[in-house]
């Protein structure tokens, strides 16, 4: 008997995201009674994102082609739901960061450190979510991306592809060969463009406030 509703399958099959999200939520609920909501949210996100990235890092070093195919198969359902929810969380965090910086009359070292950590973690979180999705899509239908030198790319290869896209809003030496993958790359490029613009704006605000 399956006790898990079908609507939750796409989350249950992503234990690392569940673990990090649960810790972040509990931490936020604990902090919000003593700290401003924006500050509590930023601290909770930073810790949750750091945990998620560590867990994904461990997965990346241990995964092989067979395990990547298996993960792609069990996580194929509702991929857009998970991706869009993740992007929404990152967007809310950036809004909370702007609110916190705007409310702070003086940009102390602690405020600057919090802003820097949040920007870095949010950027890495988004890039990692896209990297995971590229890997899943590739191993559900191999050949959608062509990596020079290998027919069986690992998570590091997909992370490289996603990080370059996040930084430059364009592909590197990897060829995109399917319409499905082009849609995902297009979304990633658009998200990266606006994310990078916002990061520049926040950075200018922090530097100006610190002077």
What are the functions of these language-model segments?
Residues 157-164, 176-211:
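Pore domain of cation channels
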Residues 100-146, 150:
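Membrane-proximal helix-loop-helix units in multi-pass membrane proteins
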Residues 90-111, 165-182:
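Alpha-helical transmembrane segments and their membrane-interface junctions
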Residues 137-138, 143-178:
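Membrane-proximal soluble regions of multi-pass membrane proteins
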Residues 37-54:
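Loop-to-helix transition at the N-terminal end of transmembrane alpha-helices
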Residues 52-65, 128-139:
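Membrane-water interface of transmembrane alpha-helices
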Residues 10-33:
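The first (N-terminal) embedded transmembrane alpha-helix
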Residues 68-86:
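Juxtamembrane helix-capping/reentrant segments at transmembrane boundaries
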